[in-house]
Swiss-Prot record:
Family assignment from sequence similarity: Belongs to the SKP1 family.
Tissues where this protein is expressed: Mainly detected in the siliques.
Protein source organism: Arabidopsis thaliana
Location of the region described as Interaction with the F-box domain of F-box proteins in the Swiss-Prot/TrEMBL record: 109-167
Pathway connected to this protein: Protein modification; protein ubiquitination
Name of the molecule in the record: SKP1-like protein 16
Length: 170
């Protein structure tokens, strides 16, 4: 792992000093490092300190996992160890996401989309999808602050036309 340190500064002026390998998990930062634009603190105006801390925690865990995978010496044991490590990481990811309410998850989605952390973006989006899969349209509207612009008559017509989609909902 690289010993270079990169300083990331959140929108609320919180600074985080991280290993270059961790910072490279944020593809936006990786491009800045490659372009020699990371010699000073990198301001991240679209990410608050508490959300950036969560992104860094995730990236640290995944960098450690990448390093652990590359340390395997024999190919035969490497496959078993690698599969075990992937399962451990999936479990860690699931536990990591359980800690957050939907508001935090939505903030994470915005941050990791901006920072281009694809694995965490997929994980956060899947968390939202899992959360809303059994929700009624009204609950989804409430979750995303969507105004219902259908008249009651239009809504009834849509529900009748697509009754199959509403069978398993509350």
């Amino acid at each position: 792992m690289s010993s270079n340190k990169i300083v990331l500064t959140s929108s609320d002026d919180e600074s985080f000093e991280v290993e270059e390998a961790v910072a490279r998990k944020l593809k936006v930062i990786a491009h800045m490092i490659d372009d020699d634009c990371a010699d000073k603190a990198i301001p991240l105006e679209n990410v608050t300190g508490n959300i950036l801390a969560l992104v860094i925690e995730y990236c640290k865990k995944h960098v450690l996992d990448d390093v652990d995978d590359s340390d395997d010496s024999t190919e035969a044991t490497s496959e078993n160890v690698n599969e075990e490590a992937k399962n451990e990481l999936r479990t860690w990811d699931a536990e990591f996401m359980k800690e957050f309410d939907m508001e935090t998850v939505m903030k994470l989605i915005l941050a990791v989309n901006y920072l281009n952390v694809q694995d965490l973006l997929g994980l956060t989006c899947q968390t939202v999808a899992d959360h809303m899969k059994d929700m009624s349209p009204e609950e989804v509207r409430e979750l995303f602050n969507i105004e219902n612009d259908y008249t009651p008559e239009e809504e009834d017509a849509i529900r009748k036309e697509n009754a199959w989609a509403f069978e398993d909902l509350k």
